[in-house]
């Protein structure tokens, strides 16, 4: 079981690396900064199944992804965590802290790595990106492009295509009155005018 996970992790790293590097336009090759966020960590294990903890998988994939991305010219990578910790042990501020860290490094995009839990029959890959609200609209278009590239690479590995998705938050509006994004990491990155994807 663990050796198959290693194979999957290696494939994911190469797929994500190819997707992100494909988005570095020649004019931007002088420098693009990608923030990688290994989901969960510390006291928050995330999903747990078959002796595996999401926080461990997200960290392993993220560290390998960092190494892969740094092999491309013009790509700088920053991490929200590099060990089994959380940027903030306070649950209510943890996601905000992750976005703040990426924004402080002037990241062009924040990629939050997760492995969802679900029924044993659930499988495949999906990518969440900013909705089509007018607020900082460029994060939507860049997020859609990045999500499509990531999803194409992941499904190319043979993972079932669960699609690229957006989700509205019916209880939150952006400052311009447009509908907010549901996921905090995407919403808060957008408020920093930074593309966030999960």
Language-model features: locations:
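Bacterial N-terminal signal peptides
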Residues: 10-22
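Acidic, glycine-rich loop-and-strand cores that form catalytic or ligand-binding grooves
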Residues: 142-167
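Active-site-adjacent mobile loop/cap segments within catalytic or ligand-binding domains
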Residues: 105, 112-119, 163-198
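Catalytic-core regions of hydrolytic enzymes
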Residues: 29-146
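Bacterial N-terminal signal peptides that target proteins for export
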Residues: 1-12
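A structural motif corresponding to the C-terminal end of an alpha-helix
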Residues: 69-73, 153-157, 188-194
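Sec-dependent signal peptide cleavage junction
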Residues: 19-32
């Amino acid at each position: 079981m663990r050796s198959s996970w290693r194979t999957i992790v290696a494939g994911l790293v190469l797929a994500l690396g190819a997707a992100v590097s494909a988005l570095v336009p020649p004019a931007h090759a002088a420098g693009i900064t990608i923030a990688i966020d290994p989901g969960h960590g510390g006291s928050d294990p995330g999903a747990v199944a078959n002796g595996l903890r999401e926080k461990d998988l997200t960290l392993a994939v993220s560290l390998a992804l960092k190494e892969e991305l740094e092999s491309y010219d013009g790509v700088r990578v920053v991490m929200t965590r590099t060990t089994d910790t959380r940027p903030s042990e306070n649950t209510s501020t943890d996601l905000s802290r992750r976005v703040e860290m990426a924004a402080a490094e002037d990241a062009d995009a924040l990629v939050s790595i997760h492995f969802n839990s679900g029924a044993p029959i659930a499988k495949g890959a999906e990518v969440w990106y900013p909705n089509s609200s007018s607020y900082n609209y460029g994060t939507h278009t860049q997020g859609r492009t990045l999500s499509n590239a990531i999803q194409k690479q992941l499904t190319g590995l043979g993972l079932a295509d669960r699609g690229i998705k957006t989700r509205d938050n019916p209880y939150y509006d952006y400052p311009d009155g447009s509908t907010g994004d549901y996921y905090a990491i995407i919403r808060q990155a957008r408020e920093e005018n930074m593309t966030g994807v999960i």
